[in-house]
Amino acid sequence: MRLCTALEGRACGSARICDDGGVGRLDELDLSLKLSRDEQDRRLKEAQTRLLALRLILGGQSGDGRIGPPLCVLFEGWDASGKGGAIKRLVMNLDPRHVRVTSFAAPTFDEKRHHFLWRFGPALPGWGGMAVLDRSWYGRVLVERVEKFATKEQWQRAYDEIAGFERTLAAEGMILVKFWMHISPDEQLRRFERRDKDPLRSWKLTDEDWRNRKKRPQYEKAVEEMLERTDLPHARWHLVEGDSKRWARVKVIETVVAEAERGMAERGFEVPKARRRSSARKR
């Protein structure tokens, strides 16, 4: 297992060194990746069109009429890392009757009375449906770990509980796509400052965001362990280089398309040939 410790100078771009002497997965990402507006527009439209065609097949609205496997897209990432913008462009052309977006914040009093996975069940899609989760059960091993809302025994146990949960979902046919949206500390600060100065967006910036930023080393360590222990064959993590919003949005949708195609083929559904498609560089 590679557990990473933040070193001084992280904000200046120095890599984190892991216990085994290697570099963490987050530091392997090339945050300089970007697209021109023209290339973004072309690839975004292409990927959105392809996703719509696949969704119609999965929903039984085209093709042979069979209802396809559920598709669940899960987002985690830093504050201001672009989750909302990516989600908006992911679903904007899809039939809202068959796609549901759910955002998860801190659990309510009643939700705390149950097992931590309990509250996510109603948001999961059934066959023919699609769900998008803005935050998820990974809060147990991220914010609840760092802020000590969960005991050490609870969050350590959660890795196996999450793996078993996702294994069950996959066994029932679900296509699960997991994203970690990654941005540099400097880019996060720039976005925070822009939000703070914008009267139409300042509400999105909270005192909690600033507090979390100060704890970035602790969160980075938690993220690295999460990736190490829950990146599984049936539920892979896709790390998105997010300093460029254009790059990130295209990569997200192209990745969902690729995973939907793969999942459909594995489950015996014919995947129609795409007229044209460019693939974002994978991590």
Q: What kind of region is each of these model predictions?
A:
Residues L58-P69:
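Phosphate-binding P-loop
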Residues S36, V99-F104, F109-Q154:
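Conserved nucleotide-sensing/catalytic segment adjacent to the nucleotide-binding pocket
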Residues V73, M174-E187, D207-R211, L232-K251:
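Phosphate-binding beta-loop-alpha motif at adenosine-nucleotide cofactor sites
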Residues R2, K215, K221-R283:
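NTP-dependent small-molecule kinase module
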Residues L3, K34, V143-E161, L169-K221, ...:
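A glycine- and Lys/Arg-enriched "phosphate-lid" helix/loop adjacent to the NTP-binding pocket
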Residues L7, R16-Q48:
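Charged, amphipathic alpha-helical linker segments immediately N-terminal to NTP-binding catalytic cores
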Residues D95-R100, G126-G129, L169-V177, D198-R201, ...:
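Short glycine-/polar-rich loops that comprise or flank the Walker A/P-loop
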Residues F75-L90:
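Glycine-rich phosphate-binding P-loop
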